[in-house]
């Protein structure tokens, strides 16, 4: 199964088996960088077997319509994963909603790549997955993430104390959302 979304500098694609070693490399390279923003890692997370299974599960979840996971790669280095964008907990019916998550390699921060990736990913899930709303939550101390979401048009919905177990403790989060102004009511029937 293939899904390729292109932007000016990036390729966004569903996880695929040939890139499983690159995904493992991304997470090993960025373990310390991502730890403050990540939930506990499952057993085997640092193994190729885990990432091969992750590919299979991601493709099944995509086919079921419950998750869209996208691996980020630069067009100039298409075999290296530099980040990921995920739309999970997709709910259809009268909700038509997903939860956004994202991460980027520490050496690629500050170059506008995540903003570029999120713009394309959001455009895809709004138009092709026919979603009405995307929720995104971030820790208050992650100021960069808050600024990124605001630039993308996300609005603050509220504050959630002890919301997620992240970096070894229950952490407060700021809840935000983005509404698809182009959503059409007939999508409720077809989604």
Which ranges hold each PLM region?
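Conserved GNAT-fold acetyl-CoA-binding loop/helix
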Residues: 33-56
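Acyl-donor (CoA/ACP) binding surface of acyl/acetyltransferases
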Residues: 1-22, 26-36, 69-191
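A short helix-loop-beta-strand connector motif used in the catalytic cores of GNAT acetyltransferases and
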Residues: 43, 55-71
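Intrinsically disordered, low-complexity regions
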Residues: 45-47, 66, 94
């Amino acid at each position: 199964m293939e899904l390729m979304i292109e932007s000016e500098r990036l390729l966004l694609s569903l996880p695929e088996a040939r890139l499983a070693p690159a995904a493992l490399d991304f997470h090993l390279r960025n373990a310390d960088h991502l730890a403050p923003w990540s939930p506990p890692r499952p057993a085997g997370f640092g193994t190729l077997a885990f990432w091969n299974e992750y590919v299979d599960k991601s493709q099944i979840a995509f086919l079921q319509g419950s998750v869209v996971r996208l691996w980020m790669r630069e067009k100039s280095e298409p075999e290296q994963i530099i980040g990921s964008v995920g739309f999970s907990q997709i709910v259809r019916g009268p909700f038509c909603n997903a939860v956004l998550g994202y991460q980027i390699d520490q050496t690629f921060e500050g170059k506008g790549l995540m903003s570029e990736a999120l713009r394309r990913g959001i455009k895809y899930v709004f138009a092709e997955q026919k979603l009405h709303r995307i929720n995104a939550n971030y820790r208050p101390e992650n100021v960069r993430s808050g600024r990124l979401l605001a630039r993308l048009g996300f609005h603050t919905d509220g504050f959630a104390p002890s919301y997620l177990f992240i970096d070894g403790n229950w952490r407060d989060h700021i809840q935000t959302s983005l509404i698809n102004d182009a959503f059409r009511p007939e999508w409720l029937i077809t989604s």
